[in-house]
Structures are given as C-alpha cells and as structure tokens.
Amino acid sequence: MKLILTADVDHLGAVGDTVEVKDGYGRNFLLPRGLAIVASRGAQKQADDIRRARETKAVRDLDHANEFKTAIEALGPVTLPVKTAGDSGKLFGSVTAGDVVAAIKKAGGPNLDKRIVRLPKAHIKALGTHPVAVHLHPEVDVEVPLEVVPQS
C-alpha cells in the first residue's frame, strides 16, 4: 500500500514522505490515527507542498539559530550573582538552567527556553567560571562562559 505521511513516524519517515507499507499496517494503524493518507495525484501535490514548506522552515530556523548564536557570543562572559553558604565558596542551593536563561536575558541576550541549556553537571554548586552549552538547533550550538559570583 502506497501512503503519504502526514506526521513524522519513527522508523518510517517524515511528513510528506511517500512510503510503501504492508496493507494491514496502513489500514489498521497509520490511516485511522491520521498519520498518513492514501497516495494519489492530488495527495502527492499536497505532499510536495508540505515538503517545500518544511524545507523553507528548516532554512529559516537555521538562520534564526545563527542570529541567536551571534547575539549570545557578543555578550561575552555572563555574570550570575548568587547567595553563598559561607566563605568556602559553596552555594546556598544551586544554579539551574532557568537561572542561566535569566542571566543571559538580563545581560541583554535573547529570550531562550531553559530546556535548550546544557549545564556541565545537573546543577552548578560552586563559585567560579563554568562553561554552559546552549543547543539552539541540531546544527548550531554555542558555549557561554558563566561566571558565578557571590551576591553583594
């Protein structure tokens, strides 16, 4: 059975791909769930339009990610003042991805989602400079030096 995917399906293809599947898989799984439509001339044209739109969006997303990367790199080291537990340099609590996003925004950077921030460990628990990776796009990553300093 020849189908055109209307959603990404693991181990099968992406939106707009024309795939050949067994009849039962197509009739009993893909079609009822709206994951695919039967391939026809009109459906093929629609799939081509979807594919073109997806490619345009991918290029736009990559350009947008590169703009964010340039803006973040222009910031230089980002300073984050935190409360310390004493003179030992240990923090009262820890620095999370949300704290990093807030520090980048406060430094004049773009508004980011905390889920794209990759800390060197689960949480930062000491003063000093820590490299923090920001995953903007599958092809674009940027490393931000984060200076954790005691709050005055």
From Swiss-Prot:
What Gene Ontology terms describe where this protein resides (cellular component)? ribonucleoprotein complex; ribosome
Q: Which UniProt keywords apply?
A: Ribonucleoprotein, Ribosomal protein, RNA-binding, rRNA-binding
Gene Ontology terms, MF aspect: rRNA binding; structural constituent of ribosome
Pfam families xref list: Ribosomal_L9_C, Ribosomal_L9_N
Which domain of life does the UniProt lineage start with? Bacteria
User: InterPro entries attached here?
Assistant: Ribosomal_bL9, Ribosomal_bL9/RNase_H1_N, Ribosomal_bL9_bac/chp, Ribosomal_bL9_C, Ribosomal_bL9_C_sf, Ribosomal_bL9_N, Ribosomal_bL9_N_sf
The reply on keyword Nucleotide-binding is no
- GO-annotated biological processes: translation
What this protein is reported to do is described as: Binds to the 23S rRNA.
The text of the family note is:
Belongs to the bacterial ribosomal protein bL9 family.
Could you identify this protein by its name? Answer: Large ribosomal subunit protein bL9
Supply the gene name. rplI
